[in-house]
Every structure is written in structure tokens, then in C-alpha cells.
Regions:
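Beta->alpha turn/N-cap motifs
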Residues: 28, 45-50, 87-89
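Short, solvent-exposed loop/beta-turn-alpha elements that line the ligand-binding surface or hinge
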Residues: 1-6, 57-61, 73-83, 133-143
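Long, aromatic- and glycine/proline-rich binding clefts that accommodate carbohydrate-like moieties
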Residues: 69-70, 122-179, 207
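Alpha-to-beta junction loops
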Residues: 37-46
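Extracytoplasmic/periplasmic substrate-recognition and gating elements
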Residues: 11, 16-19, 57-125
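Short helix-initiation/N-cap motifs at beta->coil->alpha
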Residues: 21-36
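Pocket-flanking alpha-helical
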Residues: 30-33, 50-57, 199-202
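Glycine-centered hinge/linker elements that transmit conformational signals in sensory
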Residues: 1-24
Length: 207
């Protein structure tokens, strides 16, 4: 459904890259370094890059010089979009562990999301904590996300957990994107890798 929009975004990337698109597959390029040296205006990444990008060192910025904006690729209504938000990680407790270990784990999980010390650690080292009375992180990217949300913008969610055989599926898509970007391959091959590849991996996992 959104493959043309994906193409719009991908073409925007490669046609405005700091290097020749034909050279991108050669490797050795550092988008963060290019961004830090002001060779690039935009740099696609996530909130986890905040600590690397902020500071007083070479290639780092002050808090007032960074911001995060949504993806725009021609989807109807995207002017009302906020930042993409998702995760591929979940907390879990092993039911087969010793009872005292299970309880200790549950106690720790409660402590880390409710106590002043625990939520401060989360805010400073990991980012936002979606619990009442949690500390607010300094990460400006989270502040941007909250601003969009407060304004009523919708969130595009993602969760790699639901991608069937994510590494195999992703490898097929990356290969097709590389052929398209470097060797003038067909976008139809990207569509096939994305759509049919997903169906193939889903069938393998679910019968």
C-alpha cells in the first residue's frame, strides 16, 4: 500500500546523500560523522543517538541546535503526524526461575519505575519512563515527541517483534535496495522483496 511512499523517502535519501549513491554500498561511510561535520542537514536515526550527538566535542551539538521531525513521504494526512515510536524490546520474567528470584525481579522492576532513584536512572541513561511521577529526561528528541503528541499529532508505531524472521526478511529487502541504489535495479524488485518476502517468511513461521 505504501511502497510508492517508501520509494519517495528512499529516493530523497540517496539523491541528497553526502556521497554518490553508486558508492553507498561500498561501506566505510559514517552518517553521524557527516552530520557532526555539517556535511549533512538531516540524519535519520532515533532518540538513542542523543548522547552521542550532544556535548562540546567535535561533531557534537548543544541542546538548542538539535531537533527531530517526522518522516514525510506523501501519505495523506501526514501533516498531522508526530514522531515514529516503537521498540523491539520487552521485559520478561522467567516463570521457570526460582520463586525467590522471580519475586526479586518483580520487586526490582517495580522499584525502577516508581522510585525517585530508579526513574532518575531511567531518565538519564535510557530516556522516557511512561509511568506517573517519573523523571523527565533531558533528551530533546523526547521533548520533541511530547510536543507533537500534546498538539494532537498521531504516532506511527513500530515493533520488530512482529516481523516474521526479521533478519532473513530484512536481508532480502536490503539486497534489493542495494541493487536499486547502486546498480540501477528495478523498484519492482524492492516491492517483491518487501511484500512477497514478508509473505514467504510468515508462511515459514506460521505454516
Amino acid at each position: 500500500t505504501y511502497m510508492q511512499n517508501y520509494k519517495n523517502l528512499w529516493d530523497l535519501y540517496i539523491n541528497n546523500s553526502a556521497v554518490n549513491p553508486a558508492d553507498l554500498a561500498a561501506g566505510g561511510f559514517d552518517a553521524a560523522d557527516e552530520f557532526g561535520k555539517e556535511q549533512a542537514v538531516f540524519y535519520q536515526n532515533g532518540s538513542w543517538e542523543w548522547a552521542k550527538l550532544t556535548g562540546t566535542g567535535d561533531g557534537q551539538y548543544g541542546l538548542d541546535n538539535l531537533s527531530m521531525i517526522p518522516f514525510y513521504c506523501g501519505v495523506a494526512g501526514e501533516e498531522n503526524a508526530g514522531l515514529n515510536c516503537g521498540t523491539e524490546n520487552c521485559w520478561a520474567v522467567n516463570k521457570n526461575a526460582k520463586e525467590e528470584d522471580i519475586q526479586a525481579t518483580l520487586d526490582f522492576m517495580k522499584w525502577v519505575v516508581t522510585s525517585d532513584e530508579g526513574t532518575t536512572m531511567l531518565a538519564e541513561q535510557f530516556g522516557p519512563c511512561p509511568f506517573k511521577n517519573a523523571k523527565t529526561p533531558e533528551n530533546v528528541f523526547f521533548a520533541d515527541a511530547n510536543t507533537y503528541t500534546a498538539a494532537g499529532n498521531y504516532i506511527v508505531t513500530w515493533a520488530f517483534n512482529w516481523t516474521p524472521a526479521v533478519n532473513d526478511w530484512r536481508a532480502g529487502v536490503v539486497d534489493a535496495l542495494t541493487q536499486y541504489t547502486v546498480n540501477g535495479g528495478s523498484w519492482d524488485d524492492v516491492k517483491t522483496a518487501f511484500v512477497d518476502g514478508w509473505a514467504t517468511q510468515y508462511a515459514k513461521e506460521n505454516g
